[in-house]
């Protein structure tokens, strides 16, 4: 995955400045799919494909997200109850809502992201998006002297 390409799309779709770059690897589960969240055993391994996101606080209570691969833009408020219509944006929404529920003072941010893990191939592309979003939101919160999510979460 090319960080410069992600950065160029971020600059184009947002205010012309840069933010923080975050990466998350794809993974495979060698003993079967969907066992991890159904109480089964897992034997995961990272792969050489993954996701890169550029994220920057925007000083609002809104998340503005651009999926480079899907060429799709979504904006939602952090206090909204209803998830966005775009299925990919629901992962970002869910992570933000859960962090807020756990006491993290999540602030609005702009993000553009892309990945080279095939969608729907059982390589956890949705988990990449969630972990990249959680990691970046948590780090942005700690950079801003805000409360942190417990490490056991």
Residue ranges and their predicted role:
Residues 1-127, 131-138:
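ATP-binding N-lobe of GHMP and related small-molecule kinases
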Residues 135, 139-153:
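Single conserved hydrophobic/aromatic residue that forms the stacking wall/gate
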């Amino acid at each position: 995955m090319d960080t410069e390409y992600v950065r160029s799309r971020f600059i184009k779709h947002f205010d012309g400045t840069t933010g923080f770059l975050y990466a998350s690897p794809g993974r495979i589960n060698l003993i079967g799919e969907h066992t991890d969240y159904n109480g089964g055993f897992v034997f995961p391994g990272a792969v050489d494909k993954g996701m890169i996101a550029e994220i920057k606080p925007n000083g609002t209570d809104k998340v503005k997200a651009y999926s480079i691969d899907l060429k799709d833009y979504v904006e939602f408020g952090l206090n909204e109850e209803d998830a966005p219509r775009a299925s990919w944006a629901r992962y970002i929404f869910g992570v933000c809502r859960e962090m807020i529920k756990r006491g993290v003072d999540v602030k609005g941010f702009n993000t553009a992201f892309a990945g080279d893990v095939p969608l729907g191939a059982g390589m956890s592309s949705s988990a990449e998006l969630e972990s990249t979003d959680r990691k970046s939101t948590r780090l942005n919160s700690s950079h801003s002297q805000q409360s942190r999510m417990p490490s056991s979460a």
